[in-house]
Amino acid sequence: MSCIAVEAVLLGILLYIPIVLSDDRAPIPSNSAQLNSWFDGIIQPVAVRKATMDPALVTAEGQTKVIKLKSDGSGDFKSINEAIKSIPDDNTKRVILSLAPGNYSEKVKIGMYKHYITFYGEDPNNMPILVFGGTAAEYGTVDSATLIVESNYFSAVNLKIVNSAPRPDGKRVGAQAAALRISGDKASFYNVKIYGFQDTLCDDKGKHFYKDCYIEGTVDFIFGSGKSIFLNTELHAVPGDQPAIITAQARKTDSEDTGYYFVNCRVTGGGAFLGRSWMPAAKVVFAYTEMVDAIHPEGWILVKPEHESTVRFSEYNNKGPGANMEKRAKFVKRLSDAEAKQSISLGSIEASKWLLPPRVVGLP
């Protein structure tokens, strides 16, 4: 057989071999009306995607355990903390805490070895509320959170997380109070509402995904070193005497693969800045986001003058009166179409390997 014939046969074989592409590289649509259909097409159930997902996650999703909890203590355990204690370290299966409506007045910490845990609110129209009033004065800032998650593959669906401590007045030392700290890798949040004032959400480290969420606060109310996408999420700056600051991303150098991406979100509330350069190479992107006129024209704040050449604050095709770029600070980058296409996708958090649709628990 000639070389040409061999090449033809090989080419024919290759044409019939199915090629699995990384579909999480598809750009997030600019039209919010298309988000759900786009998302459902890419992030399909684990049964369809076993070949491309983390093997340990596939195994965990194949052996699910459901724990039912009620706020009056009449569920399978008296409290969320008791239920968490029942889960062994190095857990290898998905454990779902199915939460009935009500107030769960607890400070909850999920240790770094308790993987594959889901908090699931049974009624999206009457969501369970996890509430506590810890402050930095008592616990330290990052440990003041009502919910602390240090393990991997955590997920929350239909949940309110509240830090009920009073608003800092600038006089009380240690008044900042977090509602949620997420320090584990590969975590997802669907229809989760997070309430606080200063330091509401510590998006600490790891890859995270937020969809259809609500986050409110005052100063630095989303902060940390995570690499996270916020999709169709409302960021509410609580009005007050001083302007709010939405983000304080903690990237120190360009070698760190971290950053916050807000895509198809909404910025509401009182006067606010989109972020400040808490660390020299802070990286934050806002794209396709609706911004009210309460956004200060400069948009962003430098903590130190030398940060001007090192921060990575970017905007792309935002809308609304607060999105006007005419008076934006000169260190803010307006992304090109090519740059936006490269960075505004689920591929930035390797979603094809771990991100799953929101869990729907069918209970008898």
Swiss-Prot record:
* The protein's enzyme class: hydrolase
Q: Where in the cell is it found?
A: Secreted
Where on the tree of life does the source sit, at the highest rank?
Answer: Eukaryota
| Pfam families in the record | Pectinesterase
One GO BP on record is: pectin catabolic process
Tissue spec. comment:
Expressed in pollen.
Glycosylation sites noted in the Swiss-Prot or TrEMBL record: N103
Q: Where would one find coiled-coil regions in this protein?
A: none
Q: What is its EC number?
A: 3.1.1.11
Residues spanning the signal sequence: 1-22
Q: Where is the active site?
A: D220
Cite a GO CC annotation: extracellular region
Predominant localisation class: secreted
| Catalytic activities | [(1->4)-alpha-D-galacturonosyl methyl ester](n) + n H2O = [(1->4)-alpha-D-galacturonosyl](n) + n methanol + n H(+)
Where is the chain membrane-spanning? none
Q: In which pathway does it act?
A: Glycan metabolism; pectin degradation; 2-dehydro-3-deoxy-D-gluconate from pectin: step 1/5
Report the pH sensitivity of activity.
Answer: Optimum pH is 5.5-6.0.
Print the keywords alphabetically.
Answer: Allergen, Aspartyl esterase, Glycoprotein, Hydrolase, Secreted, Signal
Report the PTM annotation. Glycosylated.
* GO MF: pectinesterase activity
Q: What does this protein do?
A: Catalyzes the demethylesterification of homogalacturonan components of pectin. May be involved in pollen tube development.
Report the sequence similarity comment from the record: Belongs to the pectinesterase family.
- Protein name as it appears in the record: Pectinesterase 1
Q: Which organism is it from?
A: Olea europaea (Common olive)
